[in-house]
Structure formats: C-alpha cells, structure tokens
Amino acid sequence: MDKKPLNTLISATGLWMSRTGKLHKIRHHEVSKRKIYIEMECGERLVVNNSRSCRAARALRHHKYRKICKHCRVSDEDLNKFLTRTNEDKSNAKVTVVSAPKIRKVMPKSVARTPKPLENTAPVQTLPSESQPAPTTPISASTTAPASTSTTAPAPASTTAPAPASTTAPASASTTISTSAMPASTSAQGTTKFNYISGGFPRPIPVQASAPALTKSQIDRLQGLLSPKDEISLDSGTPFRKLESELLSRRRKDLKQIYAEEREHYLGKLEREITKFFVDRGFLEIKSPILIPMEYIERMGIDNDKELSKQIFRVDNNFCLRPMLAPNLYNYLRKLNRALPDPIKIFEIGPCYRKESDGKEHLEEFTMLNFCQMGSGCTRENLEAIIKDFLDYLGIDFEIVGDSCMVYGDTLDVMHGDLELSSAVVGPVPMDRDWGINKPWIGAGFGLERLLKVMHNFKNIKRASRSESYYNGISTNL
C-alpha cells in the first residue's frame, strides 16, 4: 500500500504536529511542486518539504500527539477525526491471481539414456530441413565416389536412425571425402544457407543483416547535427554511427571556418545591421531597463487578460522582466516630446522574456526590435513603406494582412508564409492617455530570431537564439 504524501495527510485532517508533539490547527496552506506553505491558527508559519517519508508525515500517519496548542482551538470533532485510524478503501485493492507453475516429471535416466557412440565412428548430423538425406555410403581409402553416382534417399522426418557400425568407414589419415560433390543447401524457410565441410556435415554461412531502423532519440540527434545545406537522407538505411560520424566531421569543419574567417554571431551581426538601417534614416537608438515595474504591465492592460498574465516572469510583487519594449518606449516618447522637434523617431533592440510554449516558433528569451514615429507623417502608407524598405534591406519576402490584439486593438501583421514576423500599429489607441501621449504615432515590432530563421532557412528557431547548444545554427554538442 502506497504511503500518502504530506499534503494529502494535511488536507484530510487539517492539523499539523510539531517536532515536540504539539498539535496545531491549520488555518491555510498552499502546495507548490516540492514545498508546502502552512499558516497555523495561532499565527505560526512554516515551510516544509512535501514528502511521504518525512518526520511530519510519519507523525500524522501514526495519529499520536503529546499536547494541543492552546491558541489553535482544535475542536473535538477535528481531534476525533485525527485519532480515528481510517484505513484505505479495500474495495479499490487489486488482487492478482497467480497460478502455481506446473511441475514437469523428470524422465528416469534408464529411459532418457542416449546410446554411446562407437569408437572411430563419425557422429550423425541432422539437417535442419524437413527432408534430410540418408546416411552416406562409406567410402574406402582407395576409392572415391564420383558426384554423378551418389544417390540420396529421403528419410522420414519423425525418425532418425543411427548409422550402424558396419556402414561407417573408420577414420584414418588416408580417408578423403570430396567437398566439391556436396552442393550448398538451403533450409525450408530459405533464410539460412549451409555449406558442407569435411565429413558431409552442414556449416551455416553468415548472411549480412540490414541496418536496424533509427530510434527516435537517434533521429533527434541526427536532426540536431544537420545543417540546411546538408543533402543527407535519414531514410537511406545507413547505420546511425556512420551518419553521426559524417555529420560531426562536417560541423567541426564549419565551426573552424567561422573561427578562421567571420567570427561574428548571426544575432549580433543582425543587430548591428538593423541599427545602421534605422540610424541612417533618422531614428534615435534607445537602451531601456530590462527590469520594469509591474505597474507598467497593468497600464498595458495585460493584467486583465489571464493568458498574457501567465506569461510574465515576475521577480517579486513589484517588478518583472519586460515581456515587450513598448512600455519604456511610451515613456521615452512622452519625455522626448518636450525637447525634440517633430516628428520624433526612436527604436530599440533588446531582450524580452515571456513564458511561451516550447516550440519551433517561440522562445522564452528572445530579441525584439521596436521602432516608432510620433507626430507628423504617421499614416499607414508611411508605416508600410518603412516595413518594406526594412525587409527589402534584409532580403525577406513578406505580405501584410489585417489582424487585431488585446493590447492595441486593430493591427497589421507582417507574414512570411505562415510565420508572423511582425505586428504593426497605427495610433492613436485608447491606452495612449494612460502614458501621457496625445499625438498620432506609428510603430512595429519584429522578433530577430524569426528574421534569422527565415534568412538562414533554419527549421528550428532555437538555432537562431541565445543558446549554448547552437552557434550560428551549428550544433555545439560535438
């Protein structure tokens, strides 16, 4: 019978026993993956491990205590419930009936005795096929039977008669049997081949087996080593070790070439290219904090959406890791509006964090580009023109489709096939007044890892991310 974990015992009794045997009434408790947070009626708080075999679990399971806490007000009903030993429901017990093994009768040695082979007599070999040849006619030392005159009579499959001593030629140095007269035979199933050795007995010829099918872990390993430029099929029947060795050799060569020539990380190189593009077009580069107040998240309206709220990496009750760049850019637009001429154009490239589902298109740590313009010229036509110039600069095909989201309302999605590259907005939007913005604006956000995935034809977005497992899409697990 399995022992109940500590959280089950606490939920069943509502009581806690201290190390000194004092019984407490539990006011509230919360269970995490490994810990239990307990608050007593007397105000005492503690954190314990959720275990089956800890001291507290054993004490609650044995229903014994020394005294009751005076401030916890343990009722008689709770006490009686704790003292009553409730066994597990026996109706749920599974009973497995195991039959005793049958005892085989051992044949007496007098019945199971095998005849002793005669001296100077070759043992009889039975072929594995159902039709087996009769004993071969003995050949003397002075004569050799030609292959054309030898005859073979099939023997019954159920009986095998031992060769009599009178029909077996004695073994001597002058006795020879021609092996060329014995053709290779095949078993009834046609899978095992035999060749005949001296004495007319079959010897199996090994048949080379095909390479076994690749397991899922082997396929995952090979796919991690594959590069988009590799033309290697995993269904070719090539053994795993041979495929792995070939791919490892190629990846080491690729890393050596990068180290000798380029020495630039794809993500860092793309950041520098994007920075040059926007700086040359009059945009001001921004670097804002990664740790932001939870108040910014509430102002963006994320706390009202349950799914988006679950994606926030909270540091404590007051701060979190930024899930987007927009809050800080809002603040910069409001402050720079007091000093800079119209229009104000800014952009930022930096890491963001969300508890995204693990997949080929999502990362929990990713790099965002946000650009925005506030004031004159903030039209949809100008926004689409900036997006077109930017993606043409990177050499990426795209199309723009209409969409909507909870934060901004109506948006423009920039798509590359089925992959969303960006979400763009033409302001103003209702939340602008919460940030002190009262002018029209346009803006868009791009995920740099998705841009790299398209540019280098990566099948998995992790190859383009901040990772210790990949460098420029090349596996480092070599």
Swiss-Prot record:
Enzyme class: ligase
Region (Disordered): 106-188
Single Gene Ontology MF annotation: ATP binding
Chief location: cytoplasm
Bias-annotated ranges (Polar residues): 122-132
GO cellular component: cytoplasm
Subcellular location(s) per record: Cytoplasm
UniProt cross-references to InterPro entries, sorted A to Z: aa-tRNA-synth_II, aa-tRNA-synth_II/BPL/LPL, Phenylalanyl-tRNA_Synthase, Pyrrolysyl-tRNA_ligase, Pyrrolysyl-tRNA_ligase_C, Pyrrolysyl-tRNA_ligase_N
Swiss-Prot/TrEMBL keywords: Aminoacyl-tRNA synthetase, ATP-binding, Cytoplasm, Ligase, Nucleotide-binding, Protein biosynthesis
Domain of life of the source: Archaea
Catalytic reaction equation(s): tRNA(Pyl) + L-pyrrolysine + ATP = L-pyrrolysyl-tRNA(Pyl) + AMP + diphosphate
GO biological process: tRNA aminoacylation for protein translation
EC number: 6.1.1.26
UniProt biased composition (Low complexity): 133-188
Record function comment: Catalyzes the attachment of pyrrolysine to tRNA(Pyl). Pyrrolysine is a lysine derivative encoded by the termination codon UAG.
Family: Belongs to the class-II aminoacyl-tRNA synthetase family.
Protein name: Pyrrolysine--tRNA ligase
Organism: Methanosarcina thermophila
